[in-house]
């Protein structure tokens, strides 16, 4: 009768016999090991209960660099995660998140960790000086392109080499076209002849000021004048030697420069060309913080597409 009443209330009861003592002990507080039952399960039910899978802990090695993963990170669980940017030989990475979520901190951390690889190079285009502290802490160079004395480039430094002279021709033609001057085949031929004359001069004489002085076309001189020391952007491009120098860790603050579209394209083209000469097979990390700002710029957007 007791069993009937209990079952009627929705409880499942069983009359114990040989297991009566264990069942009674298991009902008392503190007896955790008494009345341990091992019910018989069907195989399909058991398969659903068994832990046959686990959290993916990331790749064990970076096969492209034949080295360990970039870094070991903590997770919400008990399994750490091996973070690596490469999928095969492709290391393109995009980090998206709300303002203040820590994207710049993560980028700086990735840049610091990347130096674990032998002969690694890190070049970072910054906005708001978010990476300045860690770059200087790593012994790197930080160039604020809005600072009058931060950086000086000499785009014509190596024009004695045919490949460099060809690049310089395209660069000058781009500056002239950006000034709404039509670059005709005859003008390109004249630009090339001027470059050949300049290439025969000593390296320290290969400046934009001398190039403008050698140019015969008035439209060419007018278009290039803003980039000489007679104009507002000569401090960046009209030098008799490059102050950039080689460094395995370098960052460039772009905030002020990106507010000056006329200068941004010219400076970025020359700066990218210098960096591309360093992409010689060494492990290289190129970081663009606040990339949306750079994608808005026509030249920078085209350069990113070329890299990708």
Regions found by a protein language model. Name each.
Residues 25, 29-81, 132, 136-141, ...:
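P-loop NTPase motor domains
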Residues 65-145:
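Glycine-rich phosphate-binding loop of nucleotide-binding enzymes
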Residues 1-39:
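Long, basic/Gly/Ser/Thr-rich N-terminal segments
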Residues 1, 89, 247-251:
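Glycine-rich, often proline-containing surface loops adjacent to acidic residues and nearby aromatics
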């Amino acid at each position: 009768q007791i069993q009937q009443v209990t079952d009627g209330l929705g409880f499942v009861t069983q009359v114990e016999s040989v297991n009566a003592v264990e069942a009674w002990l298991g009902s008392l507080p503190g007896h955790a090991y008494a009345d341990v039952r091992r019910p018989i399960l069907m195989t399909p039910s058991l398969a659903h209960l068994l832990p046959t899978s686990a959290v993916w802990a990331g790749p064990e090695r970076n096969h492209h660099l034949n080295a360990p993963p970039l870094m070991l990170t903590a997770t919400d669980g008990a399994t750490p995660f091996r973070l690596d940017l490469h999928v095969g030989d492709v290391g393109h990475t995009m980090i998206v998140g709300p303002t203040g979520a820590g994207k710049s901190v993560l980028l700086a951390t990735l840049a610091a960790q990347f130096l674990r690889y032998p002969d690694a190079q890190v070049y970072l285009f910054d906005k708001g000086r978010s990476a300045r502290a860690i770059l200087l802490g790593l012994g790197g160079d930080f160039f604020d392109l809005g600072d009058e004395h931060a950086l000086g480039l000499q785009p014509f430094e190596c024009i004695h080499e045919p490949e460099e002279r060809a690049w310089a021709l395209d660069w000058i033609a781009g500056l002239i076209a950006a000034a709404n001057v039509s670059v005709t085949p005859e003008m390109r031929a004249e630009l090339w002849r001027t470059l050949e004359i300049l290439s025969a001069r000593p390296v320290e004489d290969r400046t934009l000021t001398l190039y403008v002085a050698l140019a015969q076309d008035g439209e060419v001189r007018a278009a290039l004048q803003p980039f000489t020391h007679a104009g507002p952007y000569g401090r960046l491009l009209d030098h008799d030697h490059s102050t950039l120098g080689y460094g395995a860790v370098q960052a460039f603050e772009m905030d002020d420069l990106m507010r000056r579209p006329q200068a941004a394209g010219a400076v970025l083209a020359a700066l990218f060309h210098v960096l591309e000469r360093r992409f010689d097979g060494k492990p290289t990390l190129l970081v663009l913080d606040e990339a949306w700002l750079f994608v808005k710029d026509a030249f920078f957007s085209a350069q990113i597409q070329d890299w990708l």
